[in-house]
Amino acid sequence: MQMYFYNLVKDTDPEIAEAIKNELKRQQNKIELIASENFVSIAVMAAMGSPLTNKYAEGYPNKRYYGGCEYIDVVESIAIERAKKLFGAEHANVQPHSGAQANMAVYFAVLNPGDTILGMNLSHGGHLTHGSPVNFSGKLYNIVSYGVDPETETIDYDEVLRLAKEHRPKLILAGASAYPRIIDFKKFREIADEVGAYLMVDMAHIAGLVAAGLHPSPVEYADFVTTTTHKTLRGPRGGLILCKEKYAKLIDKSIFPGIQGGPLEHVIAAKAVALKEAMTEEFRNYQIQILKNAKALSERLIERGFRLVSGGTDNHLMLVDLRNKGITGKDAEKRLDSLNITCNKNAIPFDTQSPMVTSGIRLGTPAVTTRGFKEEDMIEVADIIHDALTNSDTDDNILQRVKALCEKYPLYSEFRE
């Protein structure tokens, strides 16, 4: 298969074509450890590049403001039904352009400006849209944040309950972007019921694990569940909302006409393809391997003297506290990237460094697992990280070790110029 997207673009716009080609090579030749990234299938990629991108389709299946939507309705209806089936949900909205907009839609559906949200502190593993003061959520709503216990570095449910009783939030938000442990959604439901709050769960990072039955599902406990469709779900970049049927009209109106106009039907088609892939035994085995790889990577890092926040991981990601290595997260990210390993700097709980410097890095296994990495490869990755950050091997040797792993598990080998 030719690198069709490059060849089709290069005659019209060689600059963009060159950037596309170089990005493909970057993905192929680097070890991707950013926990929120993954590699979609060729089928998902093809759906995103389909003629569906040409069609305006404001509204919902069989209730459009434009004519000519009969095939768009087929696509979106399939995506909706697959999302409901995969996660056991009563209602699904597949139109959010992103996870952030999915979260915004839930807020706009049931909250008024100034209402109180109880969500996880960004510096303890939460997300910008969970109430950060620089985000719309922090600007529009009264935010109360819970965090992790200083000793265990896991969610302090007693603190969550205490804060809920004290502040009486209208909505309690569970979910995180950098939390390596299983979240007790049943406990959050009990707390929400005690204070009469809505419960919303942002499962963006763990959606693939939930779909495969390898992480407790929030769907039975939460009034609203939001997620991205990339990350562990391995679909296109986009968002998804699941909710109880009684909230269906509120959510749908909040997305359109509330915060979005025309949906991206080519992306919705790609979501549908990814959701079908997620129903297979192959996908479940992939998620099992994600967990095995995360366990192997975390255990080897600990053996090599790294401290992991909370002592390890239950899911696909881990937070590495670098303070005992004498290097900041920012410098570690830069150092590893120079050696063809991609990760991101990340604050650790109670971090004294600024968010642009940080004391840690976040590592995840979804992307390398898609390539085919197994436990023994993750041990080598951990050793490479150790050697890179402690200068225990030459840069040339490390680059060769990274190259060997990338060549062992080629990515998008179907594409050629």
Swiss-Prot record:
The keyword Transferase applies. It is an enzyme of class 2 (transferase). Pathway: One-carbon metabolism; tetrahydrofolate interconversion; Amino-acid biosynthesis; glycine biosynthesis; glycine from L-serine: step 1/1. It catalyses: (6R)-5,10-methylene-5,6,7,8-tetrahydrofolate + glycine + H2O = (6S)-5,6,7,8-tetrahydrofolate + L-serine. Its cofactor is pyridoxal 5'-phosphate. Pfam families: SHMT (PF00464). The record marks H230 as: Plays an important role in substrate specificity. The keyword Transferase applies. It comes from the Bacteria. Its main location: cytoplasm. GO terms for biological process: glycine biosynthetic process from serine; tetrahydrofolate interconversion. (6S)-5,6,7,8-tetrahydrofolate binds at L122, G126, H127, L128. PROSITE patterns: SHMT. One of its GO terms (cellular component) is cytosol. It is found in: Cytoplasm. Catalyzes the reversible interconversion of serine and glycine with tetrahydrofolate (THF) serving as the one-carbon carrier. This reaction serves as the major source of one-carbon groups required for the biosynthesis of purines, thymidylate, methionine, and other important biomolecules. Also exhibits THF-independent aldolase activity toward beta-hydroxyamino acids, producing glycine and aldehydes, via a retro-aldol mechanism. This is Serine hydroxymethyltransferase.
